[in-house]
Design a protein with these regions (language model features):
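Short, structured segments at the rim of ligand-binding sites
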Residues: 1-139
Length: 139
């Protein structure tokens, strides 16, 4: 059973090396962004050779949302911002993880995911399952 410690506080900053688990990087980064947590994520050198250059793609799309983000050849640094830009279209770069990672931001601001069908590569029912937990999905 997992539960939150009663004294839990959202961290101000996290530093994490994902060299052994690079495929969770996009989810970790977007979670930090949505929660306003500064993060330094390292071990990301293989993200440049996935479906797309995931480091550059994350930087591009996060900046549309107003993020203060910098990348190197193997890391991403994200600083918290005051307000997330609304009604932004997120490009997926034909990468299923881009679509799935950015989708939960809809809990904070309306967003559009371009090329949403890309999720079928790994999670055919992704949009159906989001609807089941009360996400509004149109288009």
């Amino acid at each position: 059973i997992l539960s939150k410690n009663k004294d839990y506080k959202v961290p101000i900053k996290i530093n994490i090396d994902l060299v052994e688990n690079p495929d969770i990087a996009q989810t970790v980064i977007i979670t930090c962004f949505g929660l306003g947590i500064s993060c330094e994520i390292t071990g990301l050198q293989t993200l440049k050779i996935k479906e797309t250059d995931r480091l550059q793609a994350m930087k591009n799309e996060l900046r549309k949302l107003g993020a203060d983000v910098e990348i190197t050849k193997n890391s991403l640094h994200l600083s918290p911002i005051e307000k997330i830009n609304k009604n932004i279209s997120i490009n997926t770069y034909n990468d299923h993880r881009m679509a799935m990672a950015f989708s939960p931001l809809a809990m904070l601001v309306p967003i559009t995911i371009n090329n949403p069908e890309v999720v079928t590569k790994s999670y055919k029912n992704f949009w159906k399952d989001l609807k089941a937990i009360n996400f509004n999905i149109s288009g």
